[in-house]
Amino acid sequence: MHIEDLVPQQISSRMSQVRAIKEVGGKIIRFIAQFEDFQKKLWLKRKFVVQADYCVTLDRVPEKLYDEICTNDTQRREWIRLFAIDKIEGLMGFGGYSEPLTVDFLKQNPKLVLDTAYFSDDFKHKLIASMENVDEDCSGLLINSENFQALRAIQSKYENTVSVHYIDPPFNLNSGADYSYRTDYKDSTWLTLLQNRLAECRPILKDSSLIFVRCDYHGNHFVRYVLESLGYQYQSEILVSRSRNEAGSSKMDVTHEFLYLYTFPGKDVDKYKVKRSIADIKWTGFLMAGDRNPPERTFLGKTITPPKGQHFSLIQEKVDRLLDENHLRLKCRNCGTLYYKSESTAELSRKMKKKGEAFKFYDIFATTKYEGVKDVSCGCNCGCNEFTVQYLGAPDEFINDNWLDISGYSRNWGFRTENSEELMERVLKFSQEGDCVIDYFGGSCSTLATAAKMNRKWVGVEMGEQFDKVDMPRMKSVLGGEQSGISSSYPQLKSGAFKYIRLEQYEDTLNNLIVNENSDIFDDDNNSFKESYMLGYMMDTETKGSLFNLEWFVNPFAMTLKTTKDNELVKTKVDMVETFNFLIGLNVDTIHWHEDDNICVVEGVTHKEEDKTLVIWRNCKKIDNEALNRFFEKMDYSTLAHDFDLIYVNGDNTLPNLRRDDDRWKVVLIEQEFQKRMFEED
């Protein structure tokens, strides 16, 4: 169309259409944006704890609770599954397995692991009250949740705590596969999944943390991109054994995968910290390039001259020492008989049996002949007089980026991609006893099991049925002293405890939304206000009571949500006490219940600010302000004293208050802090 063809009336009509489209389109965009912002708010909201329980060895349970344990049939049946207690026989007919269990039986089996979920609230309250330092007494935390929500839940409590980060996320195979998790993400979705969780985990890592991420060839280039986009510093691309070939595939078999090691900028890895076990060292040649004078060395009475242009790598004095230590041997070039320094074969056999892992004889099998001798100057029994010198490497070989000498997977717990404890042991050797380890793609819990055996603190996350079918049984077995994997290399756990929680999920949040229509607030003549409300404020306003409701705090011990169980919505009690502990980042020392369980008192120290904190939860229907004041007097609590830096109480109260040096009030309403922490942006 040319400009001379334009008619003024057409221009005016077309412009009116454009303005109408722009106006309607803008309203549609605003309406959609309202829903997207609301969805984001629901996703980022820190979720409620809907269950918090403890797994504890019996030696940590007060004996006054043993009678109730003996009558608990659910716990007894689990002990049969995990620890085969029905096979335990007593001495002289006393103390063996029976139904019901006896107190004597419990006393004789202190390593049995009790799960508080199988007992009454009263039992659990008494057990927790017996702990002098609740959080410190627990070696780990296991979370049943989608991992993004779990990472948000623990940020305040674990900030700057974790020393080793290890994840083995689902490999993006671009197709469905026989796994218990999804493997057919689009690349963009998989990248987003990985990036979000790595970013969400960052606040809980120490500046000195080591970040390990395992992947295969499908995602190695993506993993490096994501880690470096988050500001982490590349350290190494480690090869780990795959050990699982693809049956029926026309492709060349893939024998390795990648384990990426990153750190925070400016931090290095102590490469001398981790050494290979002597079991990983193989017999090798003892010759090196170049000449040396004199060239010959004597081995077991046999003087050997190296080929021209080569030399033996050590002087005679060190050769003799290595022969004494069985780190040198001779191998007959004809028949392959192996000769070690010893008085006799029998003596050598005893030495091998006694020292066990002191040296590893890789090629001594039933078909291999070996001799313990002092002298082979007359040659081998086969008549040959030529020998090869072999050297067993020193047990302090420092590792490099080739970890193919150990298995990458195992199949002990029926999980197809179960990381081997041997691999996890090497990863965790970069840390110290007592350091904290996290794995939020828990899988079969190999990371956590290994961490527990190596006396590390641990945090693990897994979702769905996997949590109950594999993770919980495995960690209970580890706590009870099971002996698979690396167990024989470390002292058996004498006693212990760990905590596990279940979180409300995003889908649960959606299922609990109640929309309260407010159509009666609009005047018939005020269409502009009504439209603005519908387009921009409706979702937040009409669902407000679903996301946060002051009624929950009247009796916080009776607060419930609808959650999904076995594909059905069921009413589930919310643990408001534990939810708040995580929201404020409270490292709990003690938890005690009073006044017929109508008051719960939590004492601890906030993780970040290190404020000594007292939290008082009450059933306001039973404990009014006068009763609360009497309770404070009874417990000798004072809001004006310096015993605590912060005191939280639910419900309006008449407690005296004090302004702190940082201009904050000492006594704070739980409702106020709860709402702020639950919905605050990062």
Q: What do the PLM-derived regions correspond to, one by one?
A:
Residues 152:
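Conserved Rossmann-fold cofactor-binding substructure of NAD(P)-dependent oxidoreductases
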Residues 163, 169-193, 197, 206-208, ...:
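Mobile active-site "lid"/loop adjacent to the S-adenosyl-L-methionine
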Residues 411-423:
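Conserved SAM-binding loop and adjacent beta-strand
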Residues 160-176, 227, 437-451, 580:
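Conserved proline-anchored active-site loop of SAM-dependent methyltransferases
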Residues 1-123, 139, 155-159, 163, ...:
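Accessory, often C-terminal, charged low-complexity segments
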Residues 143, 212-213, 440, 460:
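Conserved SAM-binding loop
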Residues 125-142:
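Conserved P-loop NTPase mechanochemical-coupling segment
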